[in-house]
């Protein structure tokens, strides 16, 4: 049995999407047991529509719902101990739940997670890892917005943690890892990126294969399994990709509706367009993982539909099932030991 705590008030639509999404996950994985946190007047009527889910779940009342526009400091002051978001995270800390899933305010969720769960030993900064659709399948990109800036040591920690997720979600024994840079040549880029590359080249690692620097256009190609960057650049890359996908969809729609011949062509090509739309649908790869914390927290996109929220729950489910947290901690400890040994010999 895998226990997952849910911030039922999170996201643009709250319980109206969160609970149906959880119901979909329960249909696919009957060994999940949910603990829902939220305002009774809004959660209980929706939960009542899913009797099987309700019977296999627990509901705990909250006093406060964190708004999508609340500042992290404001959310901490108003929501600590009594908001659905805090209580869902705290359930992981107390051991009531194995993982937490929320579609709520990203800044507030990260602030509360850091405050409540604390960081892993020897990890200085958290990162958000996202699943990215590529020409070859999917890849992991991190950090996509947890913190701005990162030094070489932090970038290397991201590489180790990202490789751990790739092994669990993609079932790859030794994921390839690249550092996002302005060019693939070793002399290019900021000092911290070049230093991180040097560390990854010099330190023996069983759990990943360092492939050098990658450029922005390599992300969508699927050149590597894991792309590592700091949060400012990663978030811009994410928003650019999302905007480009929407732009392409709109341009295709306009082109296919412009003339009668185009409309006829669309009828014959509809299957291909449907497959493309499904490939680019953010709901199919929803679920950002907060890495570096001493517990599992999954961030669903705030505008996700029920299928999208279900995908986020499944990411948490897979992480627990694969004991990913313990493996990442072991990988980090092994890396830090190996790196210190290499550094002392140098």
From Swiss-Prot:
A Pfam cross-reference name: FA_synthesis
Molecular function via GO: phosphate:acyl-[acyl carrier protein] acyltransferase activity
Key words of the record: Cytoplasm, Lipid biosynthesis, Lipid metabolism, Phospholipid biosynthesis, Phospholipid metabolism, Transferase
Annotated metabolic or biological route of this protein: Lipid metabolism; phospholipid metabolism
Catalytic activity, EC: 2.3.1.274
Location of this chain's protein in the cell: Cytoplasm
Reaction catalysed by this enzyme: a fatty acyl-[ACP] + phosphate = an acyl phosphate + holo-[ACP]
GO CC annotation: cytoplasm
GO biological process, one term: fatty acid biosynthetic process
Cross-referenced SUPFAM superfamilies: Isocitrate/Isopropylmalate dehydrogenase-like (SSF53659)
Entry-linked InterPro entries: FA_synthesis, Phospholipid_synth_PlsX-like
Main location: cytoplasm
Gene3D superfamilies: Isopropylmalate Dehydrogenase
Subunit structure: Homodimer. Probably interacts with PlsY.
HAMAP family: PlsX
Family membership noted in the UniProt record: Belongs to the PlsX family.
Function statement: Catalyzes the reversible formation of acyl-phosphate (acyl-PO(4)) from acyl-[acyl-carrier-protein] (acyl-ACP). This enzyme utilizes acyl-ACP as fatty acyl donor, but not acyl-CoA.
Stated name of the protein: Phosphate acyltransferase
Organism, scientific name: Brucella suis biovar 1 (strain 1330)
């Amino acid at each position: 049995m895998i226990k997952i705590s849910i911030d039922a008030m999170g996201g643009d639509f709250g319980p109206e999407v969160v609970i149906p999404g959880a119901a979909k996950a329960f249909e696919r994985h009957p060994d999940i047991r949910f603990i829902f946190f939220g305002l009774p007047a809004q959660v209980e009527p929706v939960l009542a529509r899913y009797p099987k889910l309700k019977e296999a779940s627990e509901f705990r009342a909250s006093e406060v719902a964190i708004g999508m526009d609340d500042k992290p400091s404001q959310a901490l002051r108003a929501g600590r101990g009594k908001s659905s978001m805090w209580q869902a995270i705290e359930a992981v800390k107390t051991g009531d739940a194995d993982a937490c899933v929320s579609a709520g305010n990203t800044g507030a969720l990260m602030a509360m997670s850091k405050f409540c769960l604390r960081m892993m030993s020897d990890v200085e900064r958290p990162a958000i890892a996202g699943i990215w659709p590529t020409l070859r399948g999917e890849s992991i990109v991190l950090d996509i917005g947890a913190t701005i800036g990162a030094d070489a040591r932090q970038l290397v920690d991201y590489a180790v943690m990202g490789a751990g997720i790739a092994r669990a979600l993609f079932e790859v024994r030794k994921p390839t890892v690249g550092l996002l840079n302005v060019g693939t040549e070793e002399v290019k880029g900021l000092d911290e990126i070049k230093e991180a590359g040097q560390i990854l080249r010099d330190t023996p690692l069983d759990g990943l294969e360092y492939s050098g620097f990658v450029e922005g256009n390599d992300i969508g190609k699927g050149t590597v399994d894991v792309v590592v960057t700091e949060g400012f650049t990663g978030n811009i890359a994410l928003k650019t990709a999302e905007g480009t996908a929407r732009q392409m969809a709109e341009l295709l729609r306009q082109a296919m509706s412009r003339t009668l011949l185009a409309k006829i062509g669309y009828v014959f090509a509809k299957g291909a367009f449907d497959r493309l739309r499904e490939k680019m649908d953010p709901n199919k790869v929803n679920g950002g993982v907060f890495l570096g914390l001493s517990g599992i927290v999954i961030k669903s996109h705030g505008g996700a539909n029920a299928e999208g929220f279900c995908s986020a729950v499944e990411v948490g489910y897979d992480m627990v099932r694969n004991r990913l947290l313990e493996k990442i901690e072991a990988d980090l400890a092994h890396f830090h030991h190996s790196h210190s040994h290499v550094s002392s010999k140098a």
